[in-house]
């Protein structure tokens, strides 16, 4: 059987911006036989995420993710349906997910890298397992719980940068659910600002491309900032940190503004900002959700419950077709998405 896959065509260079042409689609032959312990899956949805930018370099600069290889199939978060199984834990028709799903229309995988998912948890929206009821949701929930130090009733103000993205859009809502009295988002378009305040219940939103961010932040957070969910790093974060309170907390989720630069992760703060951080005893610890696997099961159930109760609003930007994986990745890296960027490979769940 001939199937399509996406391979890494070229590297953007450590300081380069990724483009769709860094990827290419090719046809390959899928083996006819599924061996013991393997399953054949049809890919339904694939995820593109900021961390993947590091995988485009020869060296990811990280000890927990490996680089993609030139002319080899690219992989990441995926959801699909099992067409044939020779693994004891799975049967034909099961829906499964993996963090290491090849960008391929159909593929034979080792069953041990897969996890079964229950469509009822997401009311049939299987792509949510790649977003709010998946790794971005867990990153937001566990990050806020473990590093945010939110105490209900203590009038804390939370600021979220990259607030209209996959993690940011969830983190702000979770901050409110856990007890923050004021939540302010920072994003890059008027449309995103409106989305945050009218659909997600943020108290206010700042478009960092318009006006003075420091002045707007001062006006919208008169009592200062207690919790900062940092998705972007760079100048925006320096501005927020300078308005943070004594003994406040930074949740270091991502540094997308720095991903096309050859700097360590997390990037060091400028000396003046670092001085503020130390003087005010602001915590800024690297946060890696994979260190909290023991909390995943409960976390998924909590996120699903909030979603079903209407307390957690979920937004996706969906593109169709494996051939658009590169374009979807490029768009996501430049803020083209609201909520989670997803690529639909096949909407067909019949067998």
Curated annotation (Swiss-Prot):
It comes from the Eukaryota. Pfam families: ADH_N_2, ADH_zinc_N. Its main location: cytoplasm. InterPro entries: ADH-like_C, ADH_N_2, GroES-like_sf, MDR_fam, NAD(P)-bd_dom_sf, PTGR2. Keywords: Cytoplasm, Lipid metabolism, NADP, Oxidoreductase. It comes from Bos taurus. This is Prostaglandin reductase 2. GO terms for cellular component: cytoplasm. It is found in: Cytoplasm. NADP(+) binds at residues 165-168, 192, 208, 231, 253-259, 287-289, 337. It catalyses: 13,14-dihydro-15-oxo-prostaglandin E2 + NAD(+) = 15-oxoprostaglandin E2 + NADH + H(+); 13,14-dihydro-15-oxo-prostaglandin E2 + NADP(+) = 15-oxoprostaglandin E2 + NADPH + H(+); 13,14-dihydro-15-oxo-PGF2alpha + NADP(+) = 15-oxoprostaglandin F2alpha + NADPH + H(+); 13,14-dihydro-15-oxo-prostaglandin E1 + NADP(+) = 15-oxoprostaglandin E1 + NADPH + H(+). The lineage of its organism: Eukaryota, Metazoa, Chordata, Craniata, Vertebrata. Monomer. Belongs to the NADP-dependent oxidoreductase L4BD family. Transmembrane segments: none annotated. One of its GO terms (molecular function) is 15-oxoprostaglandin 13-oxidase [NAD(P)+] activity. Its EC number is 1.3.1.48. The keyword Oxidoreductase applies. Functions as 15-oxo-prostaglandin 13-reductase and acts on 15-keto-PGE1, 15-keto-PGE2, 15-keto-PGE1-alpha and 15-keto-PGE2-alpha with highest activity towards 15-keto-PGE2. Overexpression represses transcriptional activity of PPARG and inhibits adipocyte differentiation. Substrate binds at residues 99-100, 288-290. GO terms for biological process: prostaglandin metabolic process.
